[in-house]
Curated annotation (Swiss-Prot):
The keyword Cell membrane applies. Keywords: Cell membrane, Membrane, Plasmid, Plasmid copy control. Involved in copy number control of pIP404. This basic and hydrophobic protein may exert its effect from the cytoplasmic membrane. GO terms for biological process: plasmid maintenance. It is found in: Cell membrane. This is Copy number protein. One of its GO terms (cellular component) is plasma membrane.
Length: 198
């Protein structure tokens, strides 16, 4: 069976995305484990989530020849990977702050973080609505920008010598990544919109 260049590129993209997500999730887990006592419920959630990512990716690759005819499914695939990773990082970040802060301080952090998270989500949904009005759903430039920003944040934080306990930095970085990965909901919105139009 001869595989077209577009299909090969798609396979490479899917495997790359899966590899990046799994690596980030491993970093999140080991950082979480190092900073605070691991919550068994969160450990189980991370385990099931990453197993789900692998299964979904394998199914997509297995039926790729048929699924490639439905580009909307790629948006659903990307949406699931990134939006669930976003929620995972948000939950872990808040859980870490819950363990290291007093309840009153945690409530303030919780409210502020949720408001900022919703603002990020609103930004991506507004961006996709504008793109759909212009009949342009190609999101690669936005995705590239987000990954560049994420990489720069990681580099900056790794080079600065903070006089702050490490677990605060880890908690905040997890929260930053949870906000960045809200663009997963952007892909889900594209999928839902395409299904409605069809």
């Amino acid at each position: 069976m001869i595989i077209s260049k577009d299909t090969k590129d798609l396979i490479f993209s899917i495997l790359t995305i899966l590899f990046v997500i799994l690596c980030l999730n491993l970093i999140v887990f080991f950082s979480y484990n190092k900073a605070v006592e691991v919550n068994q419920s969160i450990f189980l959630m991370m385990l099931l989530l990453n197993l789900s990512f692998i299964i979904i990716s394998l199914l997509y690759l297995l039926f790729l020849k048929k699924l490639v005819k439905f580009p909307a499914l790629l948006n659903l695939f990307l949406g699931i990977l990134f939006s669930f990773s976003s929620l995972q990082d948000l939950i872990i970040s808040l859980n870490m702050f819950y363990q290291i802060l007093s309840f009153s301080k945690f409530i303030y952090i919780f409210i502020i973080f949720i408001i900022i998270y919703i603002l990020f989500l609103s930004f991506f949904l507004t961006a996709i609505k504008k793109k759909l009005k212009n009949k342009n759903t190609y999101s690669k430039p936005i995705n590239k920008t987000i990954f560049i920003i994420a990489a720069l944040i990681g580099i900056v934080f790794s080079k600065i010598n903070f006089n702050i306990p490490q677990y605060y930095i880890i908690s905040f970085l997890m929260y930053v990544f949870s906000c960045i990965f809200t663009f997963g909901f952007y892909h889900i919105y594209i999928y839902i919109n395409s299904v409605k139009n069809n």
